């Protein structure tokens, strides 16, 4: 809601609301006698361009791709978000999906937003080594363990590196990533990860969710990413530590 100040009789008044609003309809409530000369809106968003394309012989699929690209765009501002109407915070479960989509739809300037999110996630690592999102945070600190594994793993951090070719963030965050996967997370005698509930043990929507299977899958994908980073940084001992766990027990 934006309320304009009153003006004198007969004045021509121009006003631009500086607040960022979104929605499906704009309602104007005007005093009697006010004549509207013009109504406009100014689109704002993240500094990127729609450079990707998709085309097939099915008009529905072409329209779906176009709308999907727009949906991705409106979830970008100071950070990736779930949606601007309900959740503008940087939920990393959403960001994993969105950063991967950006490579197909948007210009390279979009890469910076994902890297910013990577730094923020790791910079908010807690004293016990655990990670949580959304970050930056002031009223939230609940870890969703499986979402954090997805974030730091193959479809999160590694996808950002692989498709962008930008490895500058890897040496900055690697030690904290290693601590999370090998101190915060533990494996049992057979080499399988021990389930962690965190503060919110969410595996998927619905019922009959096999958290054991999901934990193993996401932990494996996180180790797979870490091993690639370790080899890139010349951390041979770390890579050798990862190999028997990820490739003997989890495959």
Feature-to-residue mapping (PLM):
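Single conserved hydrophobic/aromatic residue that forms the stacking wall/gate
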Residues: 2-13, 249
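Exposed aromatic-hydrophobic patches
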Residues: 14-18
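Active-site acid/base region of carbohydrate-active enzymes
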Residues: 25, 33-67, 73, 80-132, ...
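Conserved, well-structured interaction surfaces
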Residues: 141-142
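Conserved, charged catalytic cores of large soluble enzymes
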Residues: 218-232
């Amino acid at each position: 809601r934006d309320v304009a100040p009153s003006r004198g009789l007969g004045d021509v008044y121009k006003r631009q609301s500086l607040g960022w609003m979104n929605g499906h309809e704009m309602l104007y409530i005007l005093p009697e006698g006010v004549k509207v000369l013009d109504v406009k809106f100014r689109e704002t968003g993240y500094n990127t361009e729609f450079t990707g394309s998709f085309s097939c012989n099915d008009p529905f699929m072409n329209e779906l791709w176009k709308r999907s690209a727009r949906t991705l765009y409106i979830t970008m501002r100071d950070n990736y978000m779930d949606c601007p109407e309900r959740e503008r915070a940087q939920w990393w479960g959403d960001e994993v999906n969105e950063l991967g989509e950006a490579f197909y739809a948007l210009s390279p300037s979009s890469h910076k937003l994902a890297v910013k999110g990577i730094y923020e996630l790791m910079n908010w690592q807690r004293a016990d080594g655990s990670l949580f999102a959304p970050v930056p945070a002031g009223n939230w600190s609940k870890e969703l363990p499986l979402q954090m594994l997805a974030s730091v793993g193959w479809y999160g951090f590694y996808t950002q590196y692989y498709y962008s070719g930008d490895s500058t963030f890897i040496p900055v965050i690697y030690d904290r990533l290693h601590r999370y996967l090998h101190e915060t997370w533990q494996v049992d005698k057979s080499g399988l990860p021990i389930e962690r509930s965190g503060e919110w043990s969410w595996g998927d929507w619905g019922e009959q969710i096999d958290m054991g299977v999901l934990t193993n899958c996401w932990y494996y994908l996180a180790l797979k990413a870490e091993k690639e980073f370790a080899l890139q940084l010349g951390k041979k001992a770390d890579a050798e530590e990862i190999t028997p766990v990820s490739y003997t027990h989890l495959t």
